[in-house]
Design a protein with these regions (language model features):
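Short, Lys/Arg-enriched N-terminal segments with co-localized hydrophobic residues
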Residues: 3-8, 12-26
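Extended rod-forming repeat segments used as scaffolds/tethers
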Residues: 9-15, 43, 63, 364, ...
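Acidic-residue sensor for enzyme active/binding pockets
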Residues: 56-59, 64-65, 145, 199, ...
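Short, conserved clusters of charged catalytic residues that mark active-site
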Residues: 84, 126, 172, 332, ...
Length: 434
């Protein structure tokens, strides 16, 4: 498989985290409806929220349905430095309970050297135009995320908004229902974020605008069911799902989180395909979808620092049915760090995230090993720096990234002919988190 094809079939989720029944929305239907749907939703929200805010209920809702005091939503996961709106909109949806409405709207511009075939040297794009609807409390809970997006990732082609939304996870990328009989135990099902890895799927969920090299070896969003159980200081999750959005329910994954204190935590996560599946699409890379993988993520979070070292191992077993005639593995490590200036600083609102990564693959083409990076046996390192500013719901950030690959297979690396071994990008993203 050519490198461009493999990289098109990119996967952390984003979660760092991991069954709707049915297939993804088709690209053509999605392309024609994304922006119309967003406009209709915006108009509908305006019509609903105005009377909802003006009207006071004469009856006290049931205790489990009573809206909580305004606070930032914890879904989608946003580990920083960007933070969610602390005063989210909400309205009473009757039998559906109190519904919180938040979202992300952001364009970006990108410049790169050594672009892949079909890619552009410079471009502008909508990176997010999404609404989030959720009921996060009570016995019955739900979350629905709708809209358009892109998923920029290091060392891969950039796909515009229409193609990314249509060919990855559709205009409804995440949606699930959850039953939580106790605070410690819950069951959920739908389109879920992966449990594996340290980075999440969408730009606003991460320290950096672009996802990293390690993220590209992990699932991002899966259809499936998940059990969650908390027994302080431990939290467990177990999922049966379709892995890399394959619509083949042959994956099992799980995670265990140990919270030492409010500043330190450790997450061990693993998953894999217990069968061999031959599906290959943009969202479902053939070899990665037939892999097993393990990640170990430690996080230290104490202002002004957040530091996350991260280890990853993956293995694709030999299977002639998918073209892997010998097995191959990847070994990777990363450090994600962020420094945020305090409120008493003249640079209040500014943060400086940085990411270092190294990823190595095994095998060789002569023995029929699968290509997991830039040819069998190749390796790569990256650095990403993303100065960020946020004021209330507004944010702006600029990003420099550089990827350098070694032991590449000619034709499977960077540039129009796949012969270059480095790629540098500059990205700027701005928007609102309402």
């Amino acid at each position: 498989m050519q490198q461009f094809d493999r990289k098109e079939l990119l996967a952390k989720s984003c979660g760092g985290g991991g069954a709707v029944i049915g297939k993804a929305v088709s690209m053509k239907k999605t392309n024609n409806s994304i922006f119309t749907s967003a406009a209709l939703v915006s108009a509908l929200l305006g019509a609903i929220l105005a009377p909802a805010r003006a009207e006071e209920s004469t009856e006290q809702p049931a205790a489990e349905e009573k809206p909580a005091a305004p606070t930032a939503m914890t879904t989608p996961v946003m580990p920083g430095p960007l933070t969610a709106n602390p005063n989210p909109m909400s309205f009473d949806a009757g039998p559906l309970g109190p519904v919180f409405v938040t979202g992300a709207v952001s364009p970006l511009v990108l410049w790169q050297n050594n672009p892949f075939p079909g890619d552009q040297r410079s471009l502008g794009s909508l990176s997010n135009g999404q609404f989030f609807f959720q009921k996060p409390e009570g016995l019955f809970q739900y979350y629905v995320q709708a809209g358009a997006y892109t998923i920029p990732a290091l060392g891969t082609p950039y796909f515009n908004t229409n193609k990314a939304t249509g060919d990855f996870f559709g205009a409804l990328p995440m949606a699930w229902a959850k039953v939580a009989p106790t605070d410690a135990f819950s069951v959920q099902g739908g389109k879920l974020p992966t449990l594996i890895g340290a980075e999440n799927t969408f730009t606003y969920q991460n320290m950096n605008i672009e996802r990293g090299l390690l993220w590209n070896q992990e699932p991002a969003i899966s259809r499936g069911a998940q059990l969650n159980y908390t027994m302080d200081p431990l939290t467990f999750a177990f999922s049966w799902n379709d892995g890399f959005y394959s619509d083949r329910f042959t994956w099992l994954s799980g995670s265990a989180t140990y919270t030492f204190d409010k500043e330190n935590s450790l997450v061990l996560a693993a998953g894999g395909n217990y069968a061999h599946t031959t599906k290959a699409t943009l969202a479902t890379p053939l070899f990665q979808n037939n892999s097993t993988l393990l990640t170990l993520v430690y996080t230290y979070n104490s202002a002004p620092w957040t530091i996350t070292p991260y280890f990853q191992y993956t293995n694709v077993p030999a299977a002639s049915s998918i073209g892997a005639f010998t097995s191959a593995s990847t070994y990777g490590g990363a450090i994600l760090a962020n420094y945020s200036f305090g409120e008493d600083s003249p640079l209040s609102g500014f943060s400086v995230p940085i990411r270092f990564e190294y990823l190595s693959s095994t095998g060789n083409a002569a023995s029929g090993a699968p290509n997991l990076l830039y040819g069998p046996g190749s390796n790569a390192w990256s650095i990403t720096l993303t100065p960020t500013y946020q004021y209330k719901i507004f944010f702006a950030r600029a990003e420099f990234s550089h990827v350098s690959a070694n032991s590449t297979t000619p034709g499977l690396a960077f540039g129009r002919d796949g012969m270059n071994t480095t790629q540098t990008r500059f990205v700027f993203e701005t928007g609102i988190l309402f």
